[in-house]
Swiss-Prot record:
This is NAD(P)H-quinone oxidoreductase subunit H, chloroplastic. Its main location: plastid. Its EC number is 7.1.1.-. The gene is ndhH. The lineage of its organism: Eukaryota, Viridiplantae, Streptophyta, Embryophyta, Tracheophyta. It is an enzyme of class 7 (translocase). It catalyses: a plastoquinone + NADH + (n+1) H(+)(in) = a plastoquinol + NAD(+) + n H(+)(out); a plastoquinone + NADPH + (n+1) H(+)(in) = a plastoquinol + NADP(+) + n H(+)(out). NDH shuttles electrons from NAD(P)H:plastoquinone, via FMN and iron-sulfur (Fe-S) centers, to quinones in the photosynthetic chain and possibly in a chloroplast respiratory chain. The immediate electron acceptor for the enzyme in this species is believed to be plastoquinone. Couples the redox reaction to proton translocation, and thus conserves the redox energy in a proton gradient. One of its GO terms (cellular component) is chloroplast thylakoid membrane.
Length: 393
C-alpha cells in the first residue's frame, strides 16, 4: 500500500488585499514551503489617488482637506507638514500660543495613532481584549479633538501662520484630566501585555533589524529607535516649540517586534508629559498670524485692493509661493513625514513630493519575513505600522 503523497513543489499564495491583517488594501504574493516563507512580494497602489498631482493645481488652503486622507489616523501631522512648507518659504512667523496649541494637538494625535496601532497589532497575534480597551481611551482623545476643532477625524485645523480657532473654554482642564487618566491606562496595558508569556513568545526575537540595516534602508520613527538609534526629529530639528519642554527620546536596542512595541508604548507616556507641560505653560496672545502684506511697496493701496496679500487662516487667493526649493519634515507617529516643495512664484506649488514614512518602512518587509513562519508575517507587518492611504497616496 502506498503512503500519502507529499507535496514537493512550492506554493504561491495571495495574502490580501482584503485580508484583515493587511490593515488596508495591501497585497502580498507569498511563496511558501509548507509553513516557511521563501519569498514575499508586496503589491502596492490599490489606494493610489494622485495626491502629489492634485497639489499642483490647488492653493495650499484648497489642498489642506486632501492631506488628511494620507495617514487618516494621524491627520494633525499631515496638516502640520502642509503649512510648515509655505511658512518657511514665505518667512511667516507663527505666534507662540499657536505653536503651543499645535504641539498639544500633534501629541494627542500621536497618542491616538499609537493606540490604534496597539489594538489591531494585539488582535493580529491573538489577543482580542486590548482591542476594546484602546477604543475606550481613543474615544477620549477624539472627544478633545471634536471640542477643539469640530471634527473627530480629518480636522482641517492647521492654517498658514497659526491654527483655525483658539482652544474653547474649559478645554485645557478637560485635557489635563485626560492626561492624568491616560497614564493609569498605559500602566494597565503594561501590566496586561508586556509580561504576558504568550505575547512574548510571539514577538520576542521576531523581525530583528540591526542598527546598520535601518540606516541603509532609510527607516525612521519607532522602527529606527527600536534598533538602538535614538534619533527623533523633535529633538534634532527643534521645530515648533519642542525644545522648551522636558522629555526624553524613547529607544531600545534589540531591534525586534517587542522592541518596537516597547518604544511606542513609552512614546505615549512621553507625549503625555509634553502635553501636560504645554497646557500648564501655554502663553496668551493671538492664535494666528494677522499680518498683511502688499505686493506694491512703492504705493500704498487701499485695504481691499488686489495688491494686498493676507496671511493667516484666510490667505488671499493671490498668496504666492516663492521661487525656491525646500524640504520640510516632522516626526510623525510612523516616522519621518517629509515634503519636498518647489515654489514657482505662483499660487500653486510647482512640485509637491511626499516622503511617507509608511511606504519606506514597508520596503524591508520581504527581507524580514523570509525564512520565517507564515504566522509571523502578521507580527512583523503589525510591528511596522502602516496605513495604506499614506503608502499609496
Amino acid at each position: 500500500m502506498n503512503g500519502p503523497a507529499t507535496r514537493k513543489d512550492l506554493m504561491i499564495v495571495n495574502m490580501g488585499p482584503h485580508h484583515p491583517s493587511m490593515h488596508g488594501v495591501l497585497r502580498l504574493i507569498l511563496t511558501l514551503d509548507g509553513e516557511d516563507v521563501i519569498d514575499c512580494e508586496p503589491i502596492l497602489g490599490y489606494l493610489h489617488r494622485g495626491m502629489e498631482k492634485i497639489a499642483e493645481n490647488r492653493t495650499i488652503i484648497q489642498y489642506l482637506p486632501y492631506v488628511t486622507r494620507w495617514d487618516y489616523l494621524a491627520t494633525m501631522f499631515t496638516e502640520a507638514i502642509t503649512v510648515n512648507g509655505p511658512e518657511q518659504l514665505g518667512n511667516i512667523q507663527v505666534p507662540k500660543r499657536a505653536s503651543y496649541i499645535r504641539v498639544i494637538m500633534l501629541e494627542l494625535s500621536r497618542i491616538a495613532s499609537h493606540l490604534l496601532w496597539l489594538g489591531p497589532f494585539m488582535a493580529d497575534i491573538g489577543a482580542q481584549t486590548p482591542f476594546f480597551y484602546i477604543f475606550r481611551e481613543r474615544e477620549l482623545v477624539y472627544d478633545l479633538f471634536e471640542a477643539a476643532t469640530g471634527m473627530r477625524m480629518m480636522h482641517n485645523f492647521f492654517r498658514i501662520g497659526g491654527v483655525a480657532a483658539d482652544l474653547p473654554h474649559g478645554w485645557i482642564d478637560k485635557c489635563l484630566d485626560f492626561c492624568d487618566y491616560f497614564l493609569t491606562a498605559v500602566a494597565e496595558y503594561q501590566k496586561l501585555i508586556t509580561q504576558n508569556p504568550i505575547f512574548l513568545e510571539r514577538v520576542e526575537g521576531v523581525g530583528i533589524i540591526s542598527g546598520e540595516e535601518v540606516i541603509n534602508w532609510g527607516l525612521s520613527g519607532p522602527m529606527l529607535r527600536a534598533s538602538g538609534i535614538p534619533w527623533d526629529l523633535r529633538k534634532v530639528d527643534r521645530y515648533e516649540c519642542y525644545d522648551e519642554f522636558d522629555w526624553e527620546v524613547q529607544w531600545q536596542k534589540e531591534g525586534d517586534s517587542l522592541a518596537r512595541y516597547l518604544v511606542r508604548l513609552a512614546e505615549m507616556t512621553e507625549s503625555v508629559k509634553i502635553i501636560q507641560q504645554a497646557l500648564e505653560g501655554i502663553p496668551g496672545g493671538p492664535y494666528e498670524n494677522l499680518e498683511i502684506r502688499s505686493f506694491d511697496r512703492a504705493r500704498s493701496p487701499e485695504w481691499n485692493d488686489f495688491d494686498y496679500r493676507f496671511i493667516s487662516k484666510k490667505p488671499s487667493p493671490t498668496f504666492e509661493l516663492a521661487k525656491q526649493e525646500l524640504y520640510v519634515r516632522v516626526e510623525a507617529p510612523k516616522g519621518e513625514l517629509g515634503i519636498f516643495l518647489i515654489g514657482d512664484q505662483g499660487g500653486f506649488p510647482w512640485r509637491w513630493k511626499i516622503r511617507p514614512p509608511g511606504f519606506i518602512n514597508l520596503q524591508i518587509l520581504p527581507q524580514l519575513v523570509k525564512r520565517m513562519k507564515l504566522a509571523d508575517i502578521m507580527t512583523i507587518l503589525g510591528s511596522i505600522d502602516i496605513i495604506m492611504g499614506e503608502v499609496d497616496r
